[in-house]
Amino acid sequence: MTDNSKIRVVVGMSGGVDSSVTALLLKEQGYDVIGVFMKNWDDTDEFGVCTATEDYKDVAAVADQIGIPYYSVNFEKEYWDRVFEYFLAEYRAGRTPNPDVMCNKEIKFKAFLDYAMTLGADYVATGHYAQVKRDENGTVHMLRGADNGKDQTYFLSQLSQEQLQKTLFPLGHLQKSEVREIAERAGLATAKKKDSTGICFIGEKNFKQFLSQYLPAQKGRMMTIDGRDMGEHAGLMYYTIGQRGGLGIGGQHGGDNQPWFVVGKDLSQNILYVGQGFYHEALMSNSLDASVIHFTREMPEEFTFECTAKFRYRQPDSQVTVHVRGDKAEVVFAEPQRAITPGQAVVFYDGKECLGGGMIDMAYKNGQPCQYI
């Protein structure tokens, strides 16, 4: 049996069940485990209760139960500079960002990894549903989590080979239900705690209200593609391509009585375009341009390959051809895709392996840019 006692693993503990079980499993496997709670956001709610304080109490309770030391580290400045400023800049540019991708890249696997190294870590571990597999050459491949409904490789797609070399994902081979069972069997304090939802720093807060504290909303006209005025929108940043709810025009139907969707944006004119039908023609495209192209292992500077891709979390894979030119790529779809959204991540897969991805800049229909920003 391998002696893991000389291998130090620093676990990012959030106070949730996944990271609690991560720490427990590593401890049971004989590793030298340290728990670290990251405080990334000052999230005092309207009643003056700071949820981070409650979460840290849960980390402390679990760490005491399984017998590991634990610390708290404050990354609020790093988070603001590297994730939140990016988040606001994307909204200002009319895009719909994915802060979780950036949070993993810049905070959980950069700031936290650097901090863990000061504690003498050989590896860091998190409660993400993903797997790492080392080949005979020592290259680490990131694979989808065994629980298809929970797989989080989409959000980890910007991790580098250097980061993956230092990372363990102990839950990757488990189903979420098994993780809960392990927590309950061990009597962990977090066994019955519900999963957190929403964007990491907003949590359960009202998104519109939250965003308006940081960016002034500019009201404007809501139009159909053929020029009908459908009323006023609350500010382009509040809407995303393909969105159905929140338009306030449910009662105004055309002849076909179909629901209304956001089908485009014009940032320069401050116009929100709406149309009827889930597969409205303005929502369909057959290619995209992406930047910040990044691979989880070494790839050529310029090459073309076929693979599958996801354009948003939890959607089925689609067949694509990718033309890579440095840190940019053109991605051509085998079948037209709906609501390709600038600011979101496009992530590439080869079977179970997540190859990396980039950020969507523009969608195209028959070579013409879609009016999405």
Curated annotation (Swiss-Prot):
Reactions it catalyzes: S-sulfanyl-L-cysteinyl-[protein] + uridine(34) in tRNA + AH2 + ATP = 2-thiouridine(34) in tRNA + L-cysteinyl-[protein] + A + AMP + diphosphate + H(+)
Residues that hold ATP according to the record: 12-19, 38, 127
Chief subcellular location: cytoplasm
Covalent S-S links between cysteines: 103-200
Active-site residue numbers: 103, 200
Entry function: Catalyzes the 2-thiolation of uridine at the wobble position (U34) of tRNA, leading to the formation of s(2)U34.
Family per record: Belongs to the MnmA/TRMU family.
Name assigned to this protein: tRNA-specific 2-thiouridylase MnmA
Origin species: Streptococcus pyogenes serotype M5 (strain Manfredo)
Gene: mnmA
